[in-house]
Swiss-Prot record:
Keyword Hydrolase: no
Protein name from the UniProt record: tRNA U34 carboxymethyltransferase
Swiss-Prot/TrEMBL catalytic activity: carboxy-S-adenosyl-L-methionine + 5-hydroxyuridine(34) in tRNA = 5-carboxymethoxyuridine(34) in tRNA + S-adenosyl-L-homocysteine + H(+)
Binding site for carboxy-S-adenosyl-L-methionine: 91, 105, 110, 130, 152-154, 181-182, 196, 200, 315
Transmembrane segments: none
Lineage: Bacteria, Pseudomonadati, Pseudomonadota, Gammaproteobacteria, Vibrionales
Family as reported in the entry's similarity comment: Belongs to the class I-like SAM-binding methyltransferase superfamily. CmoB family.
HAMAP family linked: tRNA_carboxymethyltr_CmoB
InterPro entries cross-referenced by the UniProt entry: CmoB, Mo5U34_MeTrfas-like, SAM-dependent_MTases_sf
Function: Catalyzes carboxymethyl transfer from carboxy-S-adenosyl-L-methionine (Cx-SAM) to 5-hydroxyuridine (ho5U) to form 5-carboxymethoxyuridine (cmo5U) at position 34 in tRNAs.
Single annotated GO MF: transferase activity, transferring alkyl or aryl (other than methyl) groups
A single BP term in Gene Ontology: tRNA wobble uridine modification
Quaternary state and interactors: Homotetramer.
Organism of derivation: Aliivibrio salmonicida (strain LFI1238) (Vibrio salmonicida (strain LFI1238))
Length: 324
């Protein structure tokens, strides 16, 4: 199904990551043995994606792949049809041989908010927790990262990532593993750890922060992005049922409360670097994601509230450091 052999070889040569081989191959074998209704259809399309590196790859200002001579119309239409097999595309956008994959999320907007506050990523090893289809990992490569490892248990996200990476010539600087962070050993191996859009899905947010800290090298940097509410250090929303039609959500702290949480589990130099209300320009339905999206999740008479009456989505970015 999926071949993770190249990643095993890579970490076998890394003294810090090498112990991961004690558990990782069996975990991925178990994942591959689990049934999924759409996987055969997706893999059939993935196999038909043309192999070979695009002549021009821009990961710095966008994710754009092209050749000096554009694909002929028939080839482009065939490629677009294959890529549409992997609907819904939630994270992006991507431009692939003049095919614009207009995803539900403008993940590039989030990246533009995050990037100015990061320690330089050049030559860093990075873990991206809840990485989706790897869009932000590719942008990290654009900033010169040495290695990007993303974890996300979704079959579809992995297929989308492998499709884009195949068109990039199977770049071995980025790897997506279909795992949750709870399945990782305490690696203490990554210079930077990202957790963006994950915390509110965790039943125990403090435990999640500890798991993130356990993946960082001493002095490593955490980039945490999550939904927040307005309020002081004691403000936390715990929806009784749904929030913006999402069921699997638990805790929405204020940014100030989140700073206290990070400090309470041992992070230092914690900074709130950005707070931003999510607009319907950043998250919406498109031809590549035809299901309902943020416009349908807001109160039709008051866009400052969700349809359940909660505050509309607002996201904060915090930067923190693991002690030396």
């Amino acid at each position: 199904m999926f071949n993770f052999a190249n990643f095993y070889k890579l970490i076998a040569q890394d003294t810090i990551l090498q112990p991961w081989l004690n558990t990782l191959p069996q975990q991925l074998t178990d994942w591959q043995n689990a049934e999924h209704g759409d996987i055969e259809r997706w893999l059939k399309a993935l196999k038909k994606i043309p192999e070979g590196c695009a002549e021009n790859i821009d990961l710095k200002t966008s994710v754009t792949l092209s050749n000096n001579s554009p694909l002929i119309d028939g080839e482009r239409k065939k490629l677009e049809s294959l890529l549409r097999t992997f609907h819904p595309w939630r994270k992006g956008p991507f431009t692939v041989h003049d095919i614009h994959i207009d995803t539900e999320w403008r993940s590039d907007w989030k990246w533009d908010r995050v990037l100015p506050h990061l320690s330089p990523l050049k030559n860093r090893s990075i873990l991206d927790v809840g990485c989706g289809n790897g869009y932000h990992m590719l942008r990290m490569l654009g900033e010169g990262a040495r290695l990007c490892v993303g974890i996300d248990p979704s079959h579809l996200f992995l297929v989308q990532f492998e499709a884009i990476r195949k068109l990039m010539g199977n770049d071995q600087r980025a790897h997506l593993l279909p795992l949750g962070i709870e399945q990782l050993p305490e690696l203490n191996a990554f210079d930077t750890v990202f957790s963006m859009g994950v915390l509110y899905h965790r039943r125990s947010p403090l435990d999640h922060l500890i798991l993130l800290k356990n993946q960082l090298v001493a002095g490593g940097e955490l980039v945490l992005e999550t939904l927040v509410i307005d309020g002081d250090e004691n403000a936390v929303l715990m929806p009784v049922d749904r929030y913006a039609q999402m069921r699997n959500v638990y805790f929405f702290p204020s940014a100030k409360a989140l700073k206290v949480w990070l400090e309470s589990v041992g992070f230092i130099d914690v900074k709130i670097v950005d707070e931003c209300v999510t607009t319907t320009g950043e998250q919406r339905s498109t031809e590549w994601m035809k299901h309902n999206s943020l416009p349908e999740y807001l109160d039709p008479t008051d866009s400052s509230k969700t349809i359940e009456g909660h505050p509309a989505p607002k996201r904060a970015i915090l930067i923190a450091r693991k002690p030396d």
